[in-house]
Amino acid sequence: GLFTAICDYRREQFFKDICVPFEQGKDDLHSYLVQTLMNFKHHLVLPENAAFLRLILERTQRSPELALYIHEQGPKHIQMAIACALTKADEQGLIKCQQPIYSAQLYFGIIRDIEWRVLMGIPVQENDQETIEYINYCVDRFLEGHQKV
């Protein structure tokens, strides 16, 4: 219905703002991964987006069909975009990534604390330097885990 259509529209805006396609040769994988998480964080902490996310959680509690649809079109979709970038990087020999979907799930875990804080209404520190350092550190560890042995 109407709520699903609103979710679809907002999802399209979200993906346009957050997850641009990874272009091998043009984009450095590290920078791409860092920028995607920073875009996600900036989008997530906007009050109107945080409120909408809370509304989605409330609505999906009453509708398993809506929950599945939102998950398939939202979190799973963005994980697949990252999995695709990881697959390209693997094919180019930049990393070793035999399970790109699992790796994409692990990657998004980097900002899980921020997501939970937003969902629970806990203020998120807006110190971008600290966030940048944290995300860079985590992406470094993530990529180290995908080096050829």
At which residue positions do the language-model features occur?
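A short secondary-structure junction motif
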Residues: 9-17, 47, 63, 81, ...
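Short amphipathic alpha-helical segment with a characteristic S/N-K-E followed by hydrophobic residues
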Residues: 1-4, 13, 66, 70
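Amphipathic alpha-helical packing segments from all-alpha helical-bundle domains
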Residues: 42, 46-47, 51, 55-57, ...
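Hydrophobic alpha-helical connector segments
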Residues: 5, 10, 19-53, 100-107, ...
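Hydrophobic/aromatic-rich alpha-helical bundle segments in the mid-to-C-terminal region
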Residues: 68, 90-140, 146
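Short glycine-enriched, charge-decorated loop/helix-capping segments at active-site entrances
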Residues: 20, 73, 123-126
